[in-house]
Amino acid sequence: MSMVVYNNQECEEGNPFAGALTEFSQWLWSRPLGNPGAEDAEEEAIAAQEELEFPEDEAQARHSCLQRTTSWATPKEVSPSGRVYQTVRHSRMEYSRPTMSIRSQASYFSSSARPLPPPPVPSLMSWTPIAKYHPSSPTSTSSKLRRAAPKLIKRG
């Protein structure tokens, strides 16, 4: 069995990993799964999307998930179950309001001799309270800041 999980949190524009993750996700989703020549290959695809709005905060939350599983027959020497299962999934969540924007995305790939239970998909219901109620410190201007005099440290 092999498994790759790739996570990335984008908290500000210009994140150097954002392009790499998008590129990786596109490659992973477009990659042909399974044995293309197998006549008995079975494929299952799932697409889900959910949205929440918070009028009191002028905020929105979105979650989308795409998952594809392919299986095909294989000799018993390769797989005791007689089949190989490959799954690829891409999940993306966004939370935005006038003062902030949070984006998170993850890609997942697995290959196994037996069907694996699906990993838990993040839900907006469990994710948005973290973003919604996270306290932020008030911004201050330079006129309100008091600057301390630099201290010299002598080493001897």
From Swiss-Prot:
A single cellular component GO annotation: membrane
Organism domain of life: Viruses
Maturation and modification: Expressed as a nonphosphorylated 20kDa form and a phosphorylated 22kDa form. Phosphorylated by a host PKC-related kinase. Serine phosphorylation is required for plamodesma targeting.
Classification via InterPro entries: Luteo_VPG
Keyword Calcium tagged: no
Positions of the UniProt region annotated as Homodimerization: 38-54
Chain residue ranges for the region called Disordered: 55-80, 131-156
Major place of residence: host cell
Chain positions with Phosphoserine modification: S71, S79, S137, S140
Subcellular location: Host cell junction, Host plasmodesma; Host mitochondrion outer membrane; Host Golgi apparatus; Host chloroplast envelope
A single BP term in Gene Ontology: transport of virus in host, cell to cell
Composition skew (Basic residues), residue ranges: 144-156
Region (RNA-binding): 57-156
Keywords, in A-Z order: Host cell junction, Host Golgi apparatus, Host membrane, Host mitochondrion, Host mitochondrion outer membrane, Membrane, Phosphoprotein, Transport, Viral movement protein
Quaternary data: Homodimer. Heterodimer with movement protein P3a.
Free-text comment about domains: The N-terminus is involved in homodimerization. The C-terminus binds ssRNA. The C-terminus is phosphorylated.
Family: Belongs to the polerovirus movement protein family.
Misc. remarks from the entry: Poleroviruses are transmitted by aphids directly into phloem tissue. The virus replicates most efficiently in phloem companion cells and then moves through plasmodesmata between companion cells or into sieve elements for long distance transport.
Function summary: Together with movement protein P3a, facilitates long-distance movement of virions in host. Transports viral genome to neighboring plant cells directly through plasmosdesmata, without any budding. The movement protein allows efficient cell to cell propagation, by bypassing the host cell wall barrier. Binds ssRNA.
Protein name as catalogued: Movement protein P17
Species this chain originates from: Potato leafroll virus (strain Potato/Scotland/strain 1/1984)
